[in-house]
Amino acid sequence: LAAVNRIDRIRLGLAAISRLRNQINETTALAVWSANGPVIVRWERPRRPITVDVVTGVSVELLNSASGLVFSAWLPERRTSALIQAELARQPADAPMQTMADVQQRLAEIREKGIVAIGEHYFAGGVQALGAPVFNFRNEITMVLVVVGIVGMSDLGEDSMAMHALREAAQALSRQLGSTQPDTQASRLNHIDAIPGG
């Protein structure tokens, strides 16, 4: 199967987060990998009075964001190690991940579940998020679909409708991109080139 070019890949991703927003009425976003880490390229606002605004075009950290944890779980270590080490050096004392061993354990859990939920230690206070990987025709991670909500107002638990919808949306998009195992957490580590500037 021929590779979907970058423009088509992003176009399909944007359509996916729009449909997902309409389905669950939560903030949704699309993240890609850049030389400096994950970058949100676009987000969709839900139809509710209080929402979470998402900054686009800026790299987010790996250990305290949904997109960062998902990319870290499926990218090869050589692509993420330096960024993770730098973040570990400035982790607060109460952060759950203090060593590379802690990180590896967390990433193994994410690969096992195939999805990530982050709340208490999300980089923005009072906000929780979900992230799911999107795989390409080589069964390598290429994007991350993200759902963001306000703690106490959004149900983003591990058995929530939002999580199930996110998982289904990521798998459907993976199939569109030619993945033959979109629902397999063992999809091999990615060797994609970074997208300059996001």
Regions found by a protein language model. Give the residues of each.
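Hydrophobic/basic alpha-helical segments enriched in Actinobacteria
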Residues: 19, 36, 47-50, 78-91, ...
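A short, flexible beta-alpha/helix-coil linker loop
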Residues: 1-2, 89-90, 150-154
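Amphipathic alpha-helical effector-binding/dimerization core
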Residues: 1-87
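Short amphipathic alpha-helical signal-transduction/dimerization elements
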Residues: 68, 72, 76, 167-174, ...
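Signal-transducing coiled-coil/dimerization helices and immediately adjacent hinge/linker segments
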Residues: 182-198
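Short glycine/serine/threonine/alanine-rich loop segments
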Residues: 26, 115, 179
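Extended hydrophobic
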Residues: 99-172, 189
